[in-house]
Amino acid sequence: ADKPAIPRQGEGVGDHARAASTWLTGVHVKKTEGPDIRAGQSLDQLIAQQVGQATQLASLELALDSVEVLGACDQGYSCAYANTISWRTPTTPLPMENDPRAVFERLFGAADSTDAAARLARLREDRSVLDFVSAEANGLKRSLGAADSSKLTQYLDAVRDVERRIQTAERQADREMPVFEQPIGIPDTFEQHAKLMYDLWLLAFQTDLTRVGTFMMGKEVTGRSYPEIGVSSGHHGVSHHQNDP
């Protein structure tokens, strides 16, 4: 079982990374800068396990900062700990998406708008590709050893999950949706970016494409400045106030 979030002697640094990774997991994460990260399953993903099968997407993870999950970010702790609050499993952090266009395409596919006919055509194309992939993978499985066969089984499980999502989306394809054009990319200002991401988040819930979501307004140790309100210095440095509260 995952260990509760009790501080350990000698690990006083890395507080920012530990804060984000503990927020929805409630565990004390493993101190590492490498790929051997370990936290715990987050609350949103526990909920997604229960209600996510009924929607096209089990969950949606959004952010406003760029959110890498590789490398070191905070005093010996991996960037995965600082840059996401959603963990599918103790070793699988879910990257938070900060590009409105990518979020739109995840919700509605590579269409220009939420138009029902365009969505259905895209779904049928996706299904055709998955049918081909599944057939090829099943044929390959018969020639593999036990270890490789196990890995391929995990891959096929993921493919079947995508197939389930497509089937759910096809059943919902004729549903009326608010008119929403595909975003071009990340807006120039923080205010515009935040509003667009909130609009997409709301749209995902309104259309029942998902019922579970997380939104990380700023990653830990963010250097974002806010010139719109007269703050030209980075948030993290300003928050310390020269260590003089």
Please provide the spans of the model-predicted regions:
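Ligand-binding pockets and gating/stacking loops
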Residues: 1-245
